[in-house]
Structure formats: structure tokens, C-alpha cells
Regions:
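Charged, low-complexity, helix/coiled-coil-prone segments
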Residues: 51-68, 99, 103-115, 168-174, ...
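Catalytic adenosine-cofactor/nucleotide-binding cores of aminoacyl-tRNA synthetases and other
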Residues: 124-268, 322-351
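Basic, alpha-helical terminal appendages of large translation-related enzymes
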Residues: 1-9, 13-47, 231-239, 252, ...
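Conserved S/T- and glycine-rich ATP-binding loop of Class I adenylate-forming
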Residues: 50, 210, 317
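Short, charged/polar micro-motifs that form catalytic or ligand-binding hotspots
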Residues: 107, 157, 307
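Active-site cores that bind ATP or allylic diphosphates and position pyrophosphate for catalysis
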Residues: 4-133, 138-145, 153, 178
Length: 351
């Protein structure tokens, strides 16, 4: 075919003006040798199309059911540009045949493409794969999920600390009526996945759902799965640390913040009215190696000796020991902070 882009556009506009579908008219099939010589003398180079049969293409789609594409209403797809480069249509089919692809799963915006590609597959003697075209995802507010939304790219999600299984758990259930639950491994997720449960209505993708799932994945993550990364971050060895802090994590990187509470430096927060109470707490602090029982024993003694309870009993201790009002349970943190650092912080010293 020797038409220029401008010539093809003019043809398209004329067809639309006449109420006709903008389908390529196959004028190139009528070119004579003299016509071709004239075009090439003008410096034109040909582009190539795949000639469709004009017959309907029918297949059973795993999501959409029976699909019928009338190839007579389609333009013969361009497979090679005038500059010699190939379009996606033919190379993708060749790759699929060579790789013996059995299933092609993609968005519903490719349904028409599939009709043409099935004819190309058959023309090349390949086996037609099973097709599944799912509805396109929308943003949480119903807008188009564009590639231009960089914060939703897989690379950005990975770089921000999203666990792979958090995203996998969500994607595997989007578009179904099934509840989205955190799943720790692909084998379990695959076992419960059924393409037939995908609906035709567009699914909405909310990044906040990923955040919530990420937290739940971490909360349920066994120590063995977390151990290599904990070692890289310099966390204390053993499951006790992980079991004590994972319930406060949204991202794995949050472990670094908790390690800072343990290792310091921490600037103790001591309210003016709590100085005497913290002095009493220092006197009552169990000496020597602290254990997970030390916190409950210590606070019980303080409750009996000072009459404080609830927030007034616990918050001054947390703020003095960690500099924060919130965080992992103190029964887990106290033995990790250790006796010497606890003494210094109760005295208001940074450390």
C-alpha cells in the first residue's frame, strides 16, 4: 500500500461524511505496475497490510462469553510501516505461536484486535489460544486508570515499599464479588482464582486498598519470611522482635523507625506534671536484664504505689522511653531498649 497518512485521513473523512464506516478500501489491490513505479519515483515506500477474510470470527471468551467480530467491517490491519518497522499485531502473534502461548488475558479494549489476530494465527498455521478480555479498571472516583498516573505504576509501588503479595491479593479479586483478603503466597492465591468469577462491570482500583492490604500482609507475615530483611536492617535476632512490632507496620520500612526507638538516639518527652512520677518509676524499674514480663510487673507496682491508672499510668512512661505517644506494645519494646537506656531516658537524657 502506498497511501500517505494524509491521503488515508482524507479517505476516512469522506467515508464518515457519507455515513460509511471508515474501513480501508483496498485501493492498493488495484495498483498497476506503472502506478507502483510512479509512487516509488516520488520517493514513496510501501506499508503492508494483512488482508482479512471478510468472514465473521467467533470465539468463546473466558470472561465475555461468545464473541463475534465481523471482519468485513474492519480495516485490513497495517503490519509493517513504510519505514520498515513492524507494528505490534504480527510480531505478537509470531511470539505467541513460538512460545506456545495457551491463554491471552487482556483488557476489553483489545476485543476487536483479537478478531484480526485470530485470522493471522490461522494464516500462519498456529493454534488459536484461549482468550479472556476483562473490563478496564477505573480509579477510586470512577476515572480512567491512565498510564500517566505514575504513582500507580508497578515500579513506583515497589519503590514505595508495597509488598508484592498485597498487590497480587487485590488484583486477583478485583472485578469479582469475592472479598479481598491478604494472601501470603502465590500458590494459595492461584488455587482460589477463577477467571469465570470476573464480572463485566468495570472494577475500581483504590490505592488505599493496597495500603490496608499491605499492613495486613505484614501483620500476618511469619518471622521466617521476614528474617532476611530484618537481618539486613540490623534488627535483633529471633522471632520475639518481629512478633512484637509487626502489628504496627504499614510498610516494611517502618521497621527502621522502630529500631530507632530501641537503639536511639531518642529525645524523651516529659511533661511538667510527670517529673515526680517518672522519678518514682525510675526507682521501681526492675534492675538487670529486662524481659517481656518486666513491663507488666513494673506498671503494676507503680499503679499500687502512685494510684495512677490508665493513660496517666502508661503514657508518661511511653513518652519518656520512646519520645512517642504511639507505637508497638511496651512489653515488647522495654527489654529491647534495655536497662541502661531505660534509666537514661527516664532521667530525661537523650540516648
Amino acid at each position: 500500500c502506498y497511501e500517505t497518512p494524509d491521503e488515508l485521513e482524507r479517505k476516512r473523512k469522506r467515508q464518515l461524511a457519507r455515513g460509511m464506516p471508515p474501513v480501508y478500501d483496498r485501493a492498493a489491490l488495484e495498483l498497476t505496475d506503472d502506478d507502483i513505479a510512479t509512487f516509488e519515483a516520488e520517493g514513496r515506500t510501501p506499508h503492508y497490510r494483512f488482508k482479512l477474510s471478510g468472514n465473521p470470527i467467533i470465539w468463546d471468551d473466558m470472561v465475555r462469553g461468545e464473541q463475534r467480530i465481523e471482519t468485513a467491517s474492519l480495516s485490513d490491519p497495517v503490519i509493517r510501516r513504510a519505514d520498515g518497522t513492524w507494528l505490534y499485531t504480527l510480531p505478537s502473534v509470531v511470539d505467541d505461536i513460538d512460545a506456545e502461548i495457551t491463554h491471552v488475558i487482556r483488557g476489553e479494549d483489545h476485543v476487536t484486535n483479537s478478531g484480526a489476530q485470530i485470522e493471522i494465527i490461522e494464516a500462519l498455521g498456529g493454534k488459536v489460544p484461549v482468550f479472556a478480555h476483562f473490563s478496564l479498571m477505573l480509579t477510586a472516583d470512577g476515572g480512567a486508570l491512565s498510564k500517566r498516573l505514575g504513582s500507580l505504576s508497578l515500579r513506583d509501588m515497589r519503590d514505595s515499599g508495597v509488598e508484592p503479595m498485597s498487590l497480587n491479593s487485590l488484583i486477583a479479586r478485583l472485578g469479582t464479588a469475592d472479598p479481598v483478603e491478604p494472601v501470603q503466597d502465590m500458590a494459595t492465591l492461584i488455587k482460589g482464582f477463577d477467571m469465570k468469577r470476573l464480572g463485566r462491570a468495570p472494577a475500581r482500583f483504590d490505592a488505599e486498598d493496597v495500603t490496608r492490604l499491605n499492613a495486613r500482609i505484614l501483620h500476618d507475615m511469619p518471622y521466617e519470611a521476614a528474617a532476611p530483611r530484618l537481618a539486613e536492617m540490623g534488627a535483633p535476632e529471633g522471632a520475639a522482635f518481629w512478633d512484637g512490632v509487626k502489628g504496627n507496620l504499614t510498610l516494611f520500612a517502618d521497621v527502621a523507625d522502630i529500631l530507632r526507638l530501641i537503639k536511639g538516639p531518642v529525645s524523651p518527652v516529659i511533661e511538667a506534671g510527670d517529673a515526680d512520677y517518672l522519678a518514682a518509676a525510675l526507682d521501681a524499674l526492675p534492675q538487670g536484664a529486662l524481659t517481656e514480663q518486666s513491663w507488666s510487673e513494673w506498671t503494676q507496682d507503680l499503679k499500687e504505689s502512685t494510684g495512677r491508672k490508665g493513660r496517666a499510668l502508661f503514657m508518661p512512661l511511653r513518652q519518656a522511653l520512646t519520645g512517642k505517644a504511639h507505637g508497638p506494645e511496651m512489653q515488647h519494646l522495654l527489654p529491647l531498649i534495655g536497662y541502661d537506656k531505660a534509666v537514661a531516658r527516664l532521667q530525661g537524657k537523650e540516648g
